[in-house]
Swiss-Prot record:
InterPro entries documented for this protein: Ribosomal_eL34, Ribosomal_eL34_C_sf, Ribosomal_eL34_CS, Ribosomal_L34e_arc-type
Gene3D superfamilies, per the entry: 6.20.340.10
GO cellular component: ribonucleoprotein complex; ribosome
Keyword check for Ribonucleoprotein: yes
Domain of life: Archaea
PROSITE patterns reported in the protein's UniProt record: RIBOSOMAL_L34E (PS01145)
Source organism of the structure: Methanocaldococcus jannaschii (strain ATCC 43067 / DSM 2661 / JAL-1 / JCM 10045 / NBRC 100440)
Lineage summary: Archaea, Methanobacteriati, Methanobacteriota, Methanomada group, Methanococci
GO BP field: translation
Protein name: Large ribosomal subunit protein eL34
Keyword tags: Ribonucleoprotein, Ribosomal protein
């Protein structure tokens, strides 16, 4: 029986064949869901999908787009927001 921490489905079960021919189970943390736009809910491109520890290892330029609200709003919603802010000035 697996250790208690591995009994939940928080971990993915990956079946691997060892060099000796046995099948063993490796437990891996699941990837988080894809990042979504805060306004329309569309999937954000250019933002990696990984656990925080994996994303922390990436260079800053690969973590999210380098524009205002990058990694938070999609380009379409950002365009609308900028136009709206300019009109309210």
């Amino acid at each position: 029986m697996p250790a208690p921490r591995y009994r939940s489905r928080s971990y993915r079960r990956i079946y691997r064949r060892t060099p000796g021919g046995r099948i063993v189970i490796h437990y891996k943390r699941r990837k988080p869901g894809k990042p979504k736009c805060a306004i329309c809910g569309a999937e954000l491109h250019g933002v990696p999908r990984g656990r925080p520890v994996e994303i922390r290892k990436l260079p800053k330029s690969q973590r999210r787009p380098e524009r205002p609200y990058g990694g938070y709003l999609c380009p379409r919603c950002l365009k609308r927001l900028m136009i709206q802010k300019a009109r309210n000035l």
